[in-house]
Amino acid sequence: MTKLIIMTICLIISFIFMQMKHPLSMGLMLLTQTFLTCLLTGIYVKTFWFSYVLFLIFLGGMLILFIYVHSLSSNEMFTMSFNLTTLSLLIFFLMTLFFFIIDKSLIEQFISNMEMEMFSFNNNLINENILFLNKMYNFPTNLITLLLINYLFLTLLVTVKITKKFYGPLRPMN
């Protein structure tokens, strides 16, 4: 159920992102989308340290993009559209209500699932973390780790190339 709600919020944020015009609001939506994606990754993998590292990497990339876009954009005032905010909240609540109306046993499953998670959380925490950390470096998931290493290296090269003193689009800081 939690996964379904997070995916719904990600979908709504994706639709809102297309309506944004200011770079600051786009960055905020992208940061929120990244946070929710990392949260969803942590729920699926059952350990949150990988999603924490992924979030820090994307946050570093977002800071670089923020500096780059801020140096190129004009100095216009940032205003929030309350119509868009209320519309997105309304869509979120309607979609959540729609999920509950479609499957009435979903509420019962949600409540029993929470009770079972509370019961089994203390018993299996240590053993599950050891098994899931071992699984991360085995064959299918080691490709994600290699992709992450390559992404970090590429981000490092692009950052060094962009921020050279006389070659980049950044304004000089006085």
Curated annotation (Swiss-Prot):
Where is this gene product found?
Answer: Mitochondrion membrane
In terms of InterPro entries, this protein maps to: ComplexI_Subunit6 (IPR050269)
One Gene Ontology cellular component: mitochondrial membrane
What are the EC numbers? Answer: 7.1.1.2
Q: Where are the transmembrane segments?
A: 4-24, 25-45, 48-68, 82-102, 143-163
From the UniProt record, which GO molecular function terms apply?
NADH dehydrogenase (ubiquinone) activity
Membrane topology field: Multi-pass membrane protein
For the protein in the UniProt heading, the enzyme class is: translocase
Keyword field contains Electron transport: yes
Predominant subcellular localization, coarse grouping: mitochondrion
Give the protein's biological function: Core subunit of the mitochondrial membrane respiratory chain NADH dehydrogenase (Complex I) that is believed to belong to the minimal assembly required for catalysis. Complex I functions in the transfer of electrons from NADH to the respiratory chain. The immediate electron acceptor for the enzyme is believed to be ubiquinone.
Family assignment?
Answer: Belongs to the complex I subunit 6 family.
Question: What name does this protein carry?
Answer: NADH-ubiquinone oxidoreductase chain 6
State the species of origin.
Anopheles quadrimaculatus (Common malaria mosquito)
Name the encoding gene, please: ND6
